[in-house]
Amino acid sequence: MLLGAGCGAGTGSGGGASAPAFDRETAHAEIVAAVEKAGLPKSDLPGIGGPTPTGSTPRPTPSTERERLEERALVCTAAWQYVGPPVDGSRGDLEKAVTALVGKDWVQGERQVEKLDEHGGTMLQITLRKRGWVMYARHTGVQQSLTMEMISLHATETACMNRFTEQERKALLGDAEQG
């Protein structure tokens, strides 16, 4: 499940002109522009936070508590993802997307590289922040019997997600039984 960018107005404060709104749609547009500029692979998976495609099927009404929480969390999120066969140079292209986002005033923070398995699978995660939003840019390459790549840019509005109780966040993240 993906969670991401949000529900706040993102207005400026103080005397002078207000900063333009930075909301879910703006975050999504910046993600998509960075993906396209970097040349990341085309994804047939739905993005989160962009305009609803004309003629799309409405989402079903949530029937469980977890589904209701997921529906609430969607308004806090903007995301793009690719899951599929490996594409040459995609990790470097993710780095280019991060550079493009930094050019849009996202501030790059922590960078982690983690070994996933003994077959050479790794995960790269770069954290970015902008105006109350946190984004995780991730690239995962798995080298096992089914070789695949997962690439995602996932932004979440902090104030929007803070509206969830600790118990609701655990349920969203699948930790309810463990915590």
Question: Regions from the language model: what does each represent?
Answer:
Residues 7-11:
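Bacterial signal peptide processing site
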Residues 18-79, 177:
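Compositionally biased P/S/T/G-rich terminal and signal peptide-adjacent segments
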Residues 104, 120-141:
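Mature extracytoplasmic/lumenal regions of exported proteins
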Residues 25-40, 131-179:
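Extracellularly exposed regions in secreted/surface proteins, prominently low-complexity, repeat-rich
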Residues 72-123:
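Long, charged/polar, surface-exposed segments that mediate recognition or autoinhibition
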